[in-house]
Regions:
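Glycine-rich phosphate/adenosyl-contacting loop at the front of the ribokinase-like
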Residues: 1-64, 71-72, 224, 289-290
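Ribokinase/PfkB-type carbohydrate-kinase core domain
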Residues: 1-14, 60, 75-90, 101-214, ...
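Conserved phosphate-binding/catalytic region of the ribokinase-like
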Residues: 2-8, 189-290
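Generic secondary-structure signature for well-ordered alpha-helical cores
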Residues: 16, 54, 83, 105, ...
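Short, glycine-/polar-rich solvent-exposed loops and beta-turns at beta-strand/coil boundaries
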Residues: 92-94
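Short alpha-helix plus adjacent loop in nuclease-associated cores
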Residues: 96-99
Length: 290
């Protein structure tokens, strides 16, 4: 593995997560009492940027918050985690994005996202360098993601969540797409993508080149406390591992281990070790079909 981790620029959402933890998730029309309420920083983009920084990478966040107390709280959390927030816009007249989340005793969740400022920012004045790895998600406007793809001269990664139809131009630009198994099924065009990583929860993860499975790694055993943010930690770890020249099976195994630590943490932005510690911890993983 390369000893120097790459610079990762995340273009994505910044949310305040309002989380109600309860024994079970309500059914339609049902009210459940006895919940425990907490608020914490979140948003797929912010979660991925924080994970990249905590793993030892150089992380820059591009996104937006509202000119409100919640926005200031999100900026402080990002900066405190070591993320460069110079390109996070503070938008007058927009509320900071908010996610309303219910979590059950097994760590499963239901989420409603109110995008706020995430739906209103642009890349005006933002520049990307050739050595930057750019990581996007789909919780911000698709035009912003497309513009980032066009303007980024370096390695470009898309976490295609939430799932939606992807323009051919965007898919062709992606050096790597990361999805879970449900998203992989909902976006048929991914079978033609040059490189796709798919997570399967307890089934581990796999890598596909043009629809052909070329590598896989088993999941790490873990007791789930909260699945929010686990996929984001996986994304950050996989990007860093691949850009540090780890082969596909080992990069997947390292990302699985990071995701397992995240699942065991109650926070959407969990405490993580440095990437090299996960590399040392994880045994080799096999090539699919061998």
């Amino acid at each position: 593995m390369s000893t120097r981790l790459p610079a990762v620029t995340v273009v994505g959402s910044i949310n305040l997560d309002i989380i109600a933890t309860t024994d079970r998730l309500p059914t339609a029309g049902e009210t459940i009492g006895g919940g425990v309420l907490q608020q914490q920083p979140g948003g797929k983009g912010a979660n991925q940027a924080v994970a990249a920084a905590r793993l030892g990478g150089s992380a820059r966040m591009i996104g937006a918050v509202g000119d409100d107390a919640q926005g200031r709280q999100m900026l402080e959390a990002l900066s405190g985690a070591g993320v460069d927030t110079a390109d996070v816009a503070v938008l007058d007249g927009e509320a900071t994005g908010t996610a309303l989340i219910a979590v059950d005793r097994d760590g499963e969740n239901q989420i409603v996202v109110c995008p706020g400022a995430n739906a209103a920012f642009s890349l005006e004045g933002v520049e990307f360098g050739p050595d930057e790895t750019v990581l996007c998600q789909l919780e911000v406007g698709l035009p912003v993601v497309l513009e980032a793809a066009r303007r980024s001269p370096g390695f470009f990664v898309l976490n295609a969540a939430p799932a939606m139809d992807l323009p051919a131009e965007l898919l062709e630009r992606c050096d790597l797409v990361i999805v879970n198994e449900t998203e992989y099924e909902l976006i048929p065009a991914l079978t033609h993508a040059k490189l796709v990583a798919v997570t399967y929860g307890k089934g581990g993860s796999a890598m596909f080149e043009h629809g052909r499975r070329v590598a896989e790694a088993p999941a790490a055993a873990v007791t789930a406390a909260n699945t929010i943010g686990a996929g984001d930690a996986f994304c950050a770890a996989l990007v860093l591992a691949l850009r540090a020249n780890l082969p596909y099976p080992r990069a997947l195994a390292v990302a699985n281990a990071v995701g397992a630590d995240a699942v065991g943490d109650l926070s959407s932005q969990p405490a993580l070790a440095r990437l090299e510690e996960y590399v040392a911890r994880v045994p080799g993983a096999g090539i699919a079909g061998q």
